[in-house]
UniProtKB/Swiss-Prot annotation:
Name of the gene this protein is made from: argH
CDD domains linked: Argininosuccinate_lyase
Gene Ontology CC: one annotated term: cytosol
Localization terms from the record: Cytoplasm
Gene3D superfamilies, sorted: Fumarase/aspartase (C-terminal domain), Fumarase/aspartase (Central domain), Fumarase/aspartase (N-terminal domain)
Family affiliation: Belongs to the lyase 1 family. Argininosuccinate lyase subfamily.
Class of the enzyme per the UniProt entry, highest EC level: lyase
Higher taxonomy: Bacteria, Bacillati, Bacillota, Clostridia, Eubacteriales
Gene Ontology MF terms: argininosuccinate lyase activity
UniProt cross-references to InterPro entries, sorted A to Z: Arg_succ_lyase_C (IPR029419), Argininosuccinate_lyase (IPR009049), Fumarase/histidase_N (IPR024083), Fumarate_lyase_CS (IPR020557), Fumarate_lyase_fam (IPR000362), Fumarate_lyase_N (IPR022761), L-Aspartase-like (IPR008948)
Domain of life: Bacteria
Catalysed conversion reaction: 2-(N(omega)-L-arginino)succinate = fumarate + L-arginine
GO biological process, one term: arginine biosynthetic process via ornithine
Protein name according to UniProt: Argininosuccinate lyase
Record pathway: Amino-acid biosynthesis; L-arginine biosynthesis; L-arginine from L-ornithine and carbamoyl phosphate: step 3/3
Length: 438
């Protein structure tokens, strides 16, 4: 049975039926589809378009379908065109002809737009919750490891920072990610139900009632816009892409830091794998997979942008392709957020190695230049002097703090004994606004 067909002389071919069906993926929307239908029926009864008896029968049937799906008694599968057909045809089989009144003053165009907005809002809030949990994990990791380490530019040791300050940079990145998702939810928080196919309906329905019952702040203002655009999905996937970019950058650093070349951290066995041939290997596969899966979300974004870029108003079947892009990107970003939280919550920082890396990198060179500036030298001249000292130290395989005062005075007479205290690594992060590094 189909929800259409009166104007056709021939049946749809099996090839086309399979090609056209979206049930294999839009079945994820069953809860939203039934919820939307129930509110629609309540509104029809409120507006005297359905009788009280008719609405009660339809609501009871919809509740039984939802209950059976939730309890595993009814599988969402079969030769149905989509989730809407599945629900409506099952409803007809259960309660008879009255079920055919369910779709009064509604099109599948506004129905699917509603389902998708409800689903996107619900799942986006789940992403927000996982971001907040990851932020808590990051903050806790930083508080436990407020130790000095090298800060980098160009992947070259640059200045002293703390592990806490470094990892908290990601906390603030994820804070903005969270705010972007919440903003996207706010923008999509309008109900398309009642837009029908593209031009509303001649029935005097109550769109404000359905919007309020479904948790939206208001109905959409324009019928065509309500059923024609998926910009809210594109915005969400764009936000997910930025989250994945941040997760990927963090993953890359974890991969580097866990290598023997850095040896700053230990990733727990729970989030590592081994080699089938090399017994000694412990591979950071969790971080590598997050880095790799970033491309999947980027792909979903570009795919949906490409799908939407050339289609005229209103609904076109191309838009069926929006579901899998959101589903795939949602599944990916949620799993990656959870894996990152697990990985960071079990991470161990090697304080000895982070400190040794600081000593070997001339990371107090900028502070040494500042010392000379404080003694009256222009910064550009101080920069040149310290550069010459670094060159000298490299040749001698020594650190700035390890060369004698007599040696320093060969480069500038401004050096005094207090220079060693000034360029001490711990002291450098307790001076000026560097105190904020903690």
């Amino acid at each position: 049975m189909k929800l259409w067909g009166g104007r056709f002389k021939k049946s749809e071919s099996k090839l086309m039926e399979d090609f056209n069906s979206s049930l294999s993926f839009d079945r994820q929307l069953y809860k939203e589809d039934i919820e939307g239908s129930m509110v629609h029926v309540k509104m029809l009864a409120k507006c005297n378009i359905l009788s009280s008896e008719e609405s009660k029968a339809i609501l009871s049937g919809l509740e039984s379908i939802l209950k059976d799906i939730e309890e595993g008694k009814l599988e969402v599968e079969g030769d149905y065109e989509d989730i809407h057909s599945f629900v409506e045809i099952n409803l007809i089989e259960r309660i008879g002809q009255v079920a055919k009144k369910l779709h009064t003053a509604r099109s599948r165009n506004d129905q699917v737009a509603l389902d998708f907005r409800l689903y996107a809002k619900r799942k986006a809030l789940e992403v927000v919750e996982n971001i907040e949990y990851l932020q808590d994990v990051i903050e806790n990791l930083g508080d436990k490891n407020n130790v000095i380490m090298p800060g980098y530019t160009h992947l070259q040791r640059a200045q002293v920072v703390t592990f806490k300050h470094h990892i908290m940079a990601y906390y603030h990145m994820f804070k903005r990610d969270r705010e972007r998702i919440l903003n996207a939810i706010c923008i999509m928080d309008e109900s398309p139900l009642g837009c029908c196919a593209l031009a509303g309906t001649t029935y005097n329905i109550d769109r404000n009632f359905t919007a309020q019952e479904l948790g939206f702040k208001k109905p959409v203002d324009n019928f065509l816009d309500g059923v024609s655009d998926r910009d809210y999905v594109i915005e969400l996937i764009s936000d997910f892409s930025i989250i994945m970019m941040h997760l990927s950058r963090l993953s890359e650093e974890l991969i580097l830091w866990s290598s023997k070349e850095f040896d700053f951290i230990r990733i727990d066995d729970e989030f590592s794998t081994g080699s089938s041939i090399m017994p000694q290997k412990k591979n950071p596969d969790a971080a590598e997979l997050i880095r790799g899966k970033t491309g999947r979300v980027y792909g979903s974004l570009v795919s949906l942008l490409t799908t939407m870029k050339g289609i005229p108003l209103a609904y076109n079947k191309d838009m069926q392709e929006d579901k899998e892009q959101l589903f795939n990107s949602l599944d990916t970003v949620l799993s990656c957020l959870k894996i990152m939280s697990g990985m960071l919550s079990t991470l161990k920082v090697n304080e000895k190695n982070t400190f040794n890396a600081v000593k070997k990198g001339f990371l107090n060179a900028t502070e040494a230049a500042d010392y000379l500036v404080n003694k009256g030298m222009a910064f550009r001249d101080a920069h040149k002097v310290i550069g010459e000292i670094v060159l000298y130290c490299e040749d001698k395989n020594r650190a700035i703090e390890d060369i004698s005062l007599d040696e320093l005075k060969k480069f500038s007479s401004l050096f005094e004994e207090d220079v060693y205290d000034f360029i001490d690594y711990e002291n450098t992060i307790n001076r000026g606004i560097k105190r904020n590094l903690k």
